[in-house]
Amino acid sequence: KEGYPVGRDGCKISCVINNNFCKVECQAKWRQSDGYCYFWGLSCYCTNLPEDAQVWDSSTNKCGG
């Protein structure tokens, strides 16, 4: 599984071309994962996640509210 990790505010975790920052963020939540900064979305994106990992979903988005 892969997807955007969610911060405490329910939003995607922002980044600006900093893959190492995103890798650390992803591994803090899911130890075996990897991550990078998705340039077009300016958000961290995690890969190699467990199937039950909670990631950002547009249908359940609670960001900003």
Swiss-Prot record:
Alphabetical list of InterPro entries matching this protein: LCN-type_CS_alpha_beta_dom, Scorpion_toxin-like, Scorpion_toxin-like_sf, Scorpion_toxinL, Scorpion_toxinL/defensin
Key words, A-Z: Disulfide bond, Ion channel impairing toxin, Neurotoxin, Secreted, Toxin, Voltage-gated sodium channel impairing toxin
Domain LCN-type CS-alpha/beta, first and last residues per copy: 1-64
Superkingdom: Eukaryota
GO biological process, alphabetically ordered: defense response
Main location: secreted
SUPFAM superfamilies registered for this protein in UniProt: Scorpion toxin-like
Tissue: Expressed by the venom gland.
Disulphide linkage map: C11-C63, C15-C37, C22-C44, C26-C46
Similarity annotation: Belongs to the long (4 C-C) scorpion toxin superfamily. Sodium channel inhibitor family. Beta subfamily.
Its biological purpose: Beta toxins bind voltage-independently at site-4 of sodium channels (Nav) and shift the voltage of activation toward more negative potentials thereby affecting sodium channel activation and promoting spontaneous and repetitive firing.
Designated name of the protein: Putative beta-neurotoxin RjAa12
Organism: Rhopalurus junceus (Caribbean blue scorpion)
Lineage: Eukaryota, Metazoa, Ecdysozoa, Arthropoda, Chelicerata
